[in-house]
Amino acid sequence: MARLLNKFLASASVVAGLSGVFSAPAMAATMTKATVNGAHLIYGINEDGNTDHETDFSVLDALNTDGANVELSGTRDHNKAVDMNNATTLTTEFDDDSTLVFSSLTNDIWGGSAPKEGYDNFAEQWFDEAWNSEESGLQDYAKNKSGFNIDQDTAFEGFMLENWFHRFSDPNVESVTKNGRYVSFDLSGHLNYEDEHGSLKMSEVVMVNDRIFYAFGDAIDSGVDNKDEQSSHSGIYTFTYKIPEPSAVLGLIAIGGMVAATKRRAQK
């Protein structure tokens, strides 16, 4: 009877440990620190309620203020990433001891392996998805820009030659929140980019830790803009994802299996 009781208690302790891990309520984490490494711009909010790069906002201030944002690899000289060979990184730290690293895109990332199979590199995947999206507007824009009924392969070559990918490589990070293993962040962009060739509805591209994020279609009206020709920062693209289970949980499951196996052997 005593041996049976000990066996029950040992098994119960493993189950209780697992239960505590899986059923612990998610807690919203507070961002405690935010630092940028590399070329960047900070856009604060001016007295008119619009974004302004002439600001005394810190990186943390910008991420905690509605409408403000941090542009990675950004410059006022042109609308492309400053450095396509070296990524600008934004590191956010939280009071749950977790860290998220946001990165501008580089030539190595565009030319690197694609998340999906069937593509030689990420640039091919991104362009294929954008071209075939009914919401991006890319096909009509490219055809209007070229002046003829251009096909996808020719358009892709043109994008590569004209370095259009650079224009999507300097993401504006507006906010970052974390609740347990759930992460949500906003990219600031155009509500509807439009020029003489047509309109585009596409977010910029950002890497978070080892994952790449982007979107096509309508942005959410941010209520602010940068007062430039294309009304930058007037749209928001929101992304949410779940961080995979930590290795500690897998280790705990393995320990539970080992305990059970050991006890089975002891009974023989």
PLM segments and residue spans:
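Short, threonine-centered small-residue motifs that mark membrane-proximal processing/anchoring sites
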Residues: 1-30, 231-262
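Short, charged juxtamembrane terminal tails flanking transmembrane helices
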Residues: 264-268
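Helix-boundary and membrane-interface capping/anchor signal
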Residues: 29-242
